[in-house]
Swiss-Prot record:
One GO molecular-function entry: triacylglycerol lipase activity
Residues annotated as the enzyme's active site: S202 (nucleophile), D351, H385
Organism placement in taxonomy: Eukaryota, Fungi, Dikarya, Basidiomycota, Ustilaginomycotina
Record GO biological process: lipid catabolic process
Residues modified by glycosylation: N360, N525
Species of the source: Malassezia globosa (strain ATCC MYA-4612 / CBS 7966) (Dandruff-associated fungus)
Residue ranges with Low complexity bias: 512-525, 541-562
Function (record text): Secreted lipase involved in Dandruff and seborrheic dermatitis (D/SD) probably via lipase-mediated breakdown of sebaceous lipids and release of irritating free fatty acids. Shows only minimal activity against triolein. Mostly converts monoolein to di- and triolein, while free fatty acids are only produced in low amounts.
Region (Disordered): 468-572
SUPFAM superfamilies in the record: alpha/beta-Hydrolases (SSF53474)
Enzyme class of the recorded protein, top EC level: hydrolase
Annotated protein name in UniProt: Secreted triacylglycerol lipase LIP6
Subcellular location, record wording: Secreted; Secreted, Cell wall
Length: 572
């Protein structure tokens, strides 16, 4: 019903929009937009301070205007390390009759190494049909669900100027500092005690999970009342390895590049100089100049961990400099980084892109260390990566309503639920019109819904489903557990619980330096982090900026006591 009409609409819109390129021109790309460059002295500001601001006309697909107030602010934040100054942009959407003490911060899946793919640019009204960077744009269509509740929506560019895809700690810092920035920005009138909820799906789960993990140490003053994430990439190395040779295998190289870029001042151009072949370097250039769908099409089904792209055909796991970084960005690995606020996680058992059991393992480890988690497994063969997100939206909104109302969340314990059936779209939660919206979005994405979904069946038949190593549908049962009791009866849950019980209660020490065998590639590892240094091409922070950072307490927190609040700091 929707496919034909929507396809026709898109074709007509595309043809109609072509003349607009000449007639009206583009809104500048981020790499050409002065707004994205911080003023002199920005390193000496506090986390969450506003460096620049502007009011914008928000839009979807570049041409569909949103009838609400929207601002963008450039704010001070941190890179992968809390003492490394950085900056990024967030986009704030304020509906009519907004509840300004209800803020939903959403990490849109960017999944790329190119600043042009940032969510902030995807929100701009360009006057031209924009479909190249479709990853954040299709999710933005769903923000209406949160705006209709009267909630303020905050959407930070969580990959930062490095476009550091899959660098969880960096994204976590940037999410938390975006919440601080909203409370400091006068035109928004967000109260200091505003309630915040963080959410992210798929590529957006990485910064969300780490924001939740870092909250108590990095931004304890924020009144966060809950977290939500699904289709979660909690173990970056495992996920990248499992994607290799699959349709979205471009994410293997993009993810590895992103993590290294986040720590460039420590490991330099490690992948480029030590790992990639000449063909691999060509692929790297493509990643640094493409959004996710362009890269996926270009390298559809490629095997990056092969002699064609990596020296000697080695796997990512064979490079200690890289595994050190992925270990640091694996959720649940360090007990001291356990979320303390209510957390809803959901995942399809047969997710064809991000393996269920690594997300489940993280939920178990978090629970064992005192988290308050509800982990929902959807075991139906009909639910895959995208459909699981869309059909869960009504229940996500209900969860957020409950969190803003401070309702009990499993008495502080953990709840592991198994749902064997597809979620029924409850129109009593959102209404019939939103059901139609989700069905339309599904049609745009080309995802089939229904019994014997050909997508998941083909993935299983071809052996390319990342869960082929273990799908434990027959042993999964809903259960309530306390710390130390595990989560469910899957092998991964048992393994995580056994490990928890056998270890001492002493905290694991977080590695603070790269292994001594690491070889930095060139003297430009120390170069200044100037105006998005080769902006949009993945070059990241330089260590010279870290010397300008403020000292931090053991909790890594900074409450910006010395900074002016509720105004824009000017350093022109």
């Amino acid at each position: 019903m929707y496919s034909t009409s929507l396809l026709r609409w898109l074709v007509v819109a595309l043809v109609s929009a072509v003349p607009l390129v000449t007639a009206y021109g583009f809104v500048p790309y981020p790499q050409n937009d002065a707004f994205y460059y911080p003023p002199d002295g920005w390193q000496n500001t506090e986390r969450g301070d506003i460096l620049k601001d502007r009011k914008i006309q928000a839009a979807t697909l570049g041409i569909l205007k949103w009838n609400l107030d929207a601002w963008q602010v450039l704010y001070r934040t941190s890179g992968a390390r809390p003492n490394t100054p950085s900056y990024t942009v967030t986009t704030v959407l304020v509906p009519y009759n907004a509840k300004r003490d209800h803020v939903v911060t959403i990490a849109s899946p960017e999944n790329s190494n190119f600043i042009q793919c940032a969510p902030s640019y995807a929100f701009r009204h360009t006057g031209v049909l924009e479909i190249a960077n479709f990853e954040p744009r299709w999710e933005q269509m769903l923000y209406t669900l949160f705006l209709a509740e009267g909630w303020v929506v905050n959407a930070p560019d969580h990959e930062g100027p490095e476009s550091a895809f899959s660098a969880g700690r960096l994204g976590g810092h940037m999410m938390l500092d975006s919440m601080r920035a909203l409370q400091k920005y006068g035109p928004l009138n967000i109260p200091d005690n505003a309630m915040h909820i963080g959410h992210g799906y798929s590529g957006g789960s990485t910064p969300t999970g780490w924001a939740a993990s870092l909250l108590e140490r990095y931004a304890p003053e924020l009144n966060v009342v809950g977290w939500s994430m699904g289709g979660s990439m909690t173990d970056p190395l495992y996920t990248l390895d499992s994607l290799d040779g699959n349709p979205t295998s471009s994410l293997v190289l993009a993810g590895a590049l992103g993590i290294v870029d986040a720590y460039r001042d420590e490991v330099g151009n490690y992948l480029h100089d030590n790992v990639l072949t000449d063909e691999g370097k060509i692929a790297e250039k493509v990643m640094r100049n493409s959004c996710v769908y362009e890269a996926v099409i270009r390298y559809f089904g490629a095997t990056f961990q092969s002699e064609r792209y990596m020296k000697d055909g080695r796997k990512l796991s064979s490079f200690p400099e890289l595994t050190h970084l992925t270990d640091m960005n694996t959720m649940g690995r360090y007990p001291q980084y356990t979320p303390k606020k209510p957390f809803r996680m959901f995942h399809a058992l047969h997710d064809e892109e991000i393996a269920w059991h690594q997300a489940n393992k993280t939920a178990v480890e978090w629970c064992n260390n005192g988290a308050n988690v509800n982990f929902i497994t959807f075991s139906s063969n009909d639910l895959v990566h995208v459909t699981t997100y869309l059909w869960n939206l009504p229940y996500l909104v209900q969860y957020m309503r409950d969190r803003f109302s401070n309702k009990d969340f499993y008495g502080g314990n953990c709840q592991f639920d198994v749902e064997p059936n597809n979620p029924l779209f409850d129109t009593s939660i959102l209404g019939e019109r939103f059901k139609e919206l989700l069905e339309a979005v599904l049609d745009i994405l080309g995802k089939k819904i229904g019994p014997k979904d050909s997508i998941i069946l083909n993935m299983i038949k071809s052996g390319k489903n990342p869960n082929k190593g273990g799908v434990w549908n027959d042993v999964l049962k809903s259960t309530t557990v306390s710390p130390g009791e595990g989560g469910n009866k899957s092998p991964e849950s048992k393994k995580a619980t056994k490990k928890y019980k056998s270890e001492s209660k002493a905290e694991k020490k977080q590695p603070d330096s790269i292994p001594s065998s690491s070889s930095k590639s060139s003297s430009d590892n120390k170069s200044a982090h100037a105006k998005y240094h080769a902006h949009g091409h993945g070059h990241g922070h330089a260590s010279s900026n870290s010397n300008n950072g403020h000292s931090h307490s053991a909790k890594e927190s900074s409450t910006s006591k010395g900074s002016s609040r509720r105004h824009v700091a000017r350093f022109m």
